[in-house]
C-alpha cells in the first residue's frame, strides 16, 4: 500500500501503479488536499490502470480526508483504456460554480469501471438555478457501481450523474441526491440519455442489486425516452430493473422520482408521465 498526502504524491502513485483488475494497486489517502487551479485539465489521469483509493482517516477528528479542486474548469479524475478505480471512505469536493460538459468531477470513459464504496461522498458544487453541474459522467460502455452508503449530492441543478446510452449504473447501495433548492425543475440528480438510430433506441442499463439507503431519492432527468407529451418512445419504457437475485417492490419504485423528460427541444415535467412497477422493473408511462 502507498500512503499519499499531496496531489503530487497521488499523481505519482497513479502513474506507477501496476495492479490488475483482480488485485488493484492500493493507495491510502493520508491527508486532505486541493488540486491547484493551474493543474492539468484532468488532474489525475488513470489510463489503463487498476487502482483502489481508501482513506487513512483523520486520527484527530475521525472524519474522512478529502480531495477538492480550486477551479471548476478542471476535472479531478479521468478513466480511460479499460481502467478501474474504487474510492472508499473519502470525500470529493467539486466546488463547481457553473455548468460545462467537459468539467465533470470524474469521467468514466468507454470500457472503464468506477466503484464508489462505503464512506464515499461527492459534492459537485454550488451552481445557479440555470446551471447543470455534473458530478460523474459515465460514458458509453462504461460502468458506475455504487455500494453501501456511498453518496453523490449537494449540487443545485442535478445531473450529479450523467449516464450515456450504453452506460451502466449498478446500484448495490448508495444514493444520488439533488439539493432541494432553487426551482422545482432544478432538482434533478440522475440524467439518463437515450440514443436514437432510425427506429432503434438504446438506453442506459440501471439495475438495483441490493438494499438502498433509507433516504435514497433519485430524481430523474430523461433524454429522448418519449416521443411527445403523451407517448413513450417504443423500446425506452424500462428505466430501472431488478436482478435475478434482487426483486424490486413498490417501496423501491418510490425512491425514484421522474422530474423531466426532454426530447426535440421540448421538456415535459412530471404532470405528463409517471413511473410504475411492472414485474421486476420500474417503467415510464403517460398519465
Place the predicted regions along the sequence by residue.
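Solvent-exposed loop/turn tips at the surfaces of repeat/solenoid architectures
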Residues: 49, 56, 63-65, 70, ...
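Glycine-rich repeat segments that build the extracellular carbohydrate-interaction surface of secreted
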Residues: 3-5, 17-36, 50-60, 87
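A generic structural signal for beta-strand entry/edge sites
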Residues: 24, 50, 74-76, 84, ...
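Ankyrin repeat (ANK) tandem alpha-helical domains that serve as protein-protein interaction scaffolds
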Residues: 143, 168-170
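Short, solvent-exposed loop/turn segments that connect beta-strands within catalytic domains
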Residues: 21-23, 98-100, 128-129, 198-200
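Extracellular/surface-exposed low-complexity segments
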Residues: 1-19, 172-181, 187-287
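Extracellular beta-strand-rich solenoid/capping regions of secreted or surface-exposed proteins
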Residues: 35-52, 64-88, 93-114, 129, ...
